Amino acid sequence: MVTIAAIIYEPGNSIKNKTGTWRTFRPILDNEKCVKCENCYIFCPEGAIQEDENGNFKIDYDYCKGCLICMNECPVNAITKVREEK
């Protein structure tokens, strides 16, 4: 028997599974450069970017997989990358 796709036994359970260790690159957000366009927040497929009480965006590295979509969508280059250390 061949499994064609993953089986999701409990929809919405990804919040229980920290996936931050999958990264090769870590996005670094510079709130000084950030213009609060929310592109990073909108395009993050993991919902790992949230706005704090001061209106600054923060990356939750427990769930960030390092796809760097946030960096590619930032119009002012406020997000850079660094290689993740082992």
From Swiss-Prot:
Record flagged with keyword Cytoplasm: no
PANTHER family xref list: PYRUVATE SYNTHASE SUBUNIT PORD
Cofactor stoichiometry and binding remark: Binds 2 [4Fe-4S] clusters.
Keyword Transferase belongs to the record: no
Binding locations of [4Fe-4S] cluster 2: 44, 64, 67, 70
Record key words, sorted: 4Fe-4S, Electron transport, Iron, Iron-sulfur, Metal-binding, Repeat, Transport
Cofactor requirement: [4Fe-4S] cluster
GO molecular function: 4 iron, 4 sulfur cluster binding; metal ion binding; oxidoreductase activity, acting on the aldehyde or oxo group of donors, iron-sulfur protein as acceptor
Regions annotated as coiled coil: none
SUPFAM superfamilies in the cross-refs: 4Fe-4S ferredoxins
Source species of the chain: Methanocaldococcus jannaschii (strain ATCC 43067 / DSM 2661 / JAL-1 / JCM 10045 / NBRC 100440)
Annotated [4Fe-4S] cluster 1 binding sites: 34, 37, 40, 74
Subunit note: Heterotetramer of one alpha, one beta, one delta and one gamma chain.
Protein name: Pyruvate synthase subunit PorD
Domain (4Fe-4S ferredoxin-type): residue spans on this chain: 25-54, 55-84
Alphabetical list of InterPro entries matching this protein: 4Fe4S_Fe-S-bd, 4Fe4S_Fe_S_CS, PorD_KorD, Pyruvate_synthase_PorD
